Amino acid sequence: LIQNAVLRANRYMSALQEQRYIEGTNILEPEAFRSLVKAYLHAREKQLTECTLIQIISSDLTREEAGQKLAKLMRQSDYVGVFEDGRIYALLANTSAKDAQLVEKRFREEGFQCEIQEDIAV
């Protein structure tokens, strides 16, 4: 059931391929990102996968530059997106909160202020 939710989210993302990214960036639009995060959080609740969400609090870079730089610091299975609040988040698939601390450290070393989000409503 959870796997189906993730598959549905991925199909949804594929169907909206041209509309899912903020123009000129590799950052997922709020609706597409929210759908993906919901699927991963639901799967995590059912103990089918691990995932961690990191909020990027601030950076001296433009959103486009931040997205490009973050993508280079993450795996291909991870995602960069925004919610309606306009803030950038990184969704780390198959990553526990403990393991995400290493990614958070890497982000900080590259000039990003960030914070692991334990409880987030989507």
Give short role names for the model-derived ranges.
Residues 1-15:
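Signal-transmission/dimerization alpha-helices at domain junctions
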Residues 6-10, 44, 111:
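Conserved NTP-handling cores and scaffolds of large molecular machines
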Residues 12-26, 116-122:
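Flexible, glycine/charge-rich interdomain/linker segments that couple
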Residues 23, 27-48, 67-75:
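Short regulatory alpha-helical coupling segments
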Residues 47-60:
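Short glycine-/aliphatic-rich beta-strand segments at the starts of folded cytosolic domains
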Residues 52, 78-93, 110-122:
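A short glycine-enriched loop-to-beta-strand structural element that forms part of the catalytic core
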Residues 60, 67-101:
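Conserved helix-loop-beta segment at the catalytic/binding core of cyclic-nucleotide signaling proteins
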Residues 71, 101-113:
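Alpha-helical scaffold within the catalytic cores of cyclic-nucleotide enzymes
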